[in-house]
């Protein structure tokens, strides 16, 4: 049985505002199903005797100094938005009642 349906992929694509053809939806459903199967397989491994680690190889973070640079204006930031209102990003309401 599939872990993710085509309609769920369609719903996710709509939430992400990604236009997908029927062929792409079918292909993506299969690919995501394979990913979820792989995750389930990894989750099923018994690791009671394996000590917890954050990373198997010791690494040191390499950072750079913070440098102040000019950012985008509100207009520039909103220029790529699919919808805006009163100088803000307009997004679908997902919580609460209609205002």
From Swiss-Prot:
It comes from the Bacteria. The keyword NAD does not apply. InterPro entries: Asp/Glu-ADT_sf_sub_c (IPR036113), GatC (IPR003837). Disulfide bonds: none annotated. It is an enzyme of class 6 (ligase). Its EC number is 6.3.5.-. One of its GO terms (molecular function) is asparaginyl-tRNA synthase (glutamine-hydrolyzing) activity. GO terms for biological process: glutaminyl-tRNAGln biosynthesis via transamidation; regulation of translational fidelity; translation. It catalyses: L-glutamyl-tRNA(Gln) + L-glutamine + ATP + H2O = L-glutaminyl-tRNA(Gln) + L-glutamate + ADP + phosphate + H(+); L-aspartyl-tRNA(Asn) + L-glutamine + ATP + H2O = L-asparaginyl-tRNA(Asn) + L-glutamate + ADP + phosphate + 2 H(+). Keywords: ATP-binding, Ligase, Nucleotide-binding, Protein biosynthesis. Allows the formation of correctly charged Asn-tRNA(Asn) or Gln-tRNA(Gln) through the transamidation of misacylated Asp-tRNA(Asn) or Glu-tRNA(Gln) in organisms which lack either or both of asparaginyl-tRNA or glutaminyl-tRNA synthetases. The reaction takes place in the presence of glutamine and ATP through an activated phospho-Asp-tRNA(Asn) or phospho-Glu-tRNA(Gln). Heterotrimer of A, B and C subunits. Belongs to the GatC family. PANTHER family: GLUTAMYL-TRNA(GLN) AMIDOTRANSFERASE SUBUNIT C, MITOCHONDRIAL. This is Aspartyl/glutamyl-tRNA(Asn/Gln) amidotransferase subunit C. It comes from Kineococcus radiotolerans (strain ATCC BAA-149 / DSM 14245 / SRS30216). The gene is gatC.
């Amino acid at each position: 049985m599939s872990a993710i349906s085509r309609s769920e992929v369609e719903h996710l694509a709509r939430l992400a505002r990604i236009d997908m053809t029927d062929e792409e939806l079918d292909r993506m459903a299969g690919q995501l199903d394979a990913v979820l199967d792989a995750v389930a397989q990894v989750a099923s491994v018994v690791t009671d005797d394996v000590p917890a680690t954050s990373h198997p190889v010791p690494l040191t973070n390499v950072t750079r100094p913070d440098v102040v640079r000019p950012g985008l204006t509100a207009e520039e930031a909103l220029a790529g938005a699919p919808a805006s209102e009163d100088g803000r990003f307009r997004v679908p309401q997902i919580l609460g009642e209609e205002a």
